[in-house]
């Protein structure tokens, strides 16, 4: 029995290490399949999507993933052109999208929105970003990238730098890393440290240290995960301007890193990684984006097929 069949994907906390490893194996299988065979996995199935916040990579990644396994996609990517402008509730919109699809992807600015949608929908709901809480499919993509590029996850030193307060990818990644034996360094301005309401739960599974100085750690890291400052989540633009550009990864910083270290970023990038880093062997953020297509294809294949694929 495929334990992922019809499963909502709301939080990375809902996945054990064994389940993550099973998803990674399924992703490897997706990559290895002939494209013709791959398109049989979800042939005739439809993925619905509902984006209440802007998205380029995540939405296109899901669409490309579904197309690669033979399925179709439909939905709303510009909420201003939907019936929500007429006052339609999230619950009703979710129900309508569910009628037309076999599974649904939701991005919404409010915390708890994806879990609420899962209660309303009779089809599996996939969280593509829920307020400041989580982004579980990004974390699966990130963990898979680390494993592919470093050949393991256990016993690595991983630095996460940037906006640790508002960046939802950070929380999902930390919970995912809690399944592994890793040394995590959290590097951010004081005002953007990890939220205190999340530290207790994370510390139950993961040891980490906090710092404001990236140069204190950079030469030890196997993985540097860079995040942008989340301008849209600041209540005051003046506060944003105080921390904008706090950390910039450029060639000078790269020279201090291990030769085989890798640099990741969930994207979009603003100014936190210089473009001259892009062509170095350490830059793996575009490969990371490509892996997202395959990890999401694997998740969809597992979610929509009773016996897997």
UniProtKB/Swiss-Prot annotation:
Binding site for carbamoyl phosphate: 57-58, 107, 135, 138, 267-268
Catalytic activity from the UniProt record: carbamoyl phosphate + L-aspartate = N-carbamoyl-L-aspartate + phosphate + H(+)
EC numbers on record: 2.1.3.2
Molecular function GO terms recorded: amino acid binding; aspartate carbamoyltransferase activity
GO biological process entries: 'de novo' pyrimidine nucleobase biosynthetic process; 'de novo' UMP biosynthetic process; glutamine metabolic process
Keyword Transferase: yes
InterPro entries documented for this protein: Asp/Orn_carbamoyltranf_P-bd (IPR006132), Asp/Orn_carbamoylTrfase (IPR006130), Asp/Orn_carbamoylTrfase_sf (IPR036901), Asp_carbamoyltransf (IPR002082), Asp_carbamoyltransf_Asp/Orn-bd (IPR006131)
Keywords: Pyrimidine biosynthesis, Transferase
Binding positions (L-aspartate): 86, 168, 228
Tree of life domain: Archaea
Any one GO CC term of the record: cytoplasm
Pathway the protein contributes to: Pyrimidine metabolism; UMP biosynthesis via de novo pathway; (S)-dihydroorotate from bicarbonate: step 2/3
Enzyme class, UniProt record, top EC level: transferase
Function comment: Catalyzes the condensation of carbamoyl phosphate and aspartate to form carbamoyl aspartate and inorganic phosphate, the committed step in the de novo pyrimidine nucleotide biosynthesis pathway.
PANTHER family assigned: ASPARTATE CARBAMOYLTRANSFERASE, ORNITHINE CARBAMOYLTRANSFERASE, MITOCHONDRIAL
UniProt subunit comment: Heterooligomer of catalytic and regulatory chains.
Family classification: Belongs to the aspartate/ornithine carbamoyltransferase superfamily. ATCase family.
Designated name of the protein: Aspartate carbamoyltransferase catalytic subunit
């Amino acid at each position: 029995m495929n334990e992922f069949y019809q499963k909502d994907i709301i939080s990375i906390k809902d996945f054990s290490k064994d389940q993550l490893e099973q998803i990674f194996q399924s992703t490897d299988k997706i990559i290895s399949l002939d494209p013709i065979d791959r398109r049989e996995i979800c042939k005739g199935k439809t993925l619905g999507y509902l984006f209440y916040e802007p998205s380029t990579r995540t939405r296109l990644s899901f669409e490309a993933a579904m197309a690669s396994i033979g399925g179709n996609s439909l939905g709303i990517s510009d909420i201003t052109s939907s019936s929500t402008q007429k006052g339609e509730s999230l619950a009703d919109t979710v129900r309508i999208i569910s009628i037309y699809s076999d599974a649904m992807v939701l991005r919404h600015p409010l915390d708890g929105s994806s879990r609420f949608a899962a209660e309303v929908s009779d089809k599996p709901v996939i969280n593509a970003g829920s307020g400041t809480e989580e982004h579980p499919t990004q974390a699966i993509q990130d963990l898979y990238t680390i494993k592919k590029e470093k050949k393991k996850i256990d016993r690595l030193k991983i630095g996460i730098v940037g906006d640790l307060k508002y960046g939802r990818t950070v929380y999902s990644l930390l919970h995912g890393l809690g399944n592994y034996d890793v040394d995590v360094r959290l590097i951010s301005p004081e005002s953007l440290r990890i939220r205190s309401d999340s530290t207790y739960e994370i510390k139950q599974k993961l040891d980490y240290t906090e710092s404001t100085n990236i140069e204190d750690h950079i030469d030890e890291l196997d993985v540097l995960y860079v995040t942008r400052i989340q301008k849209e989540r600041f209540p005051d633009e003046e506060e944003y301007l105080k921390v904008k550009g706090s950390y910039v990864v450029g060639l000078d910083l790269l020279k201090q890193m291990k030769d085989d270290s890798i640099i990741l970023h969930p994207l979009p990038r603003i100014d936190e990684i210089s473009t001259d880093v892009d062509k170095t062997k350490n830059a793996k953020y575009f490969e990371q984006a490509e892996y997202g297509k395959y990890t999401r294809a694997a998740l969809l294949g597992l979610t929509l097929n009773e016996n897997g694929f």
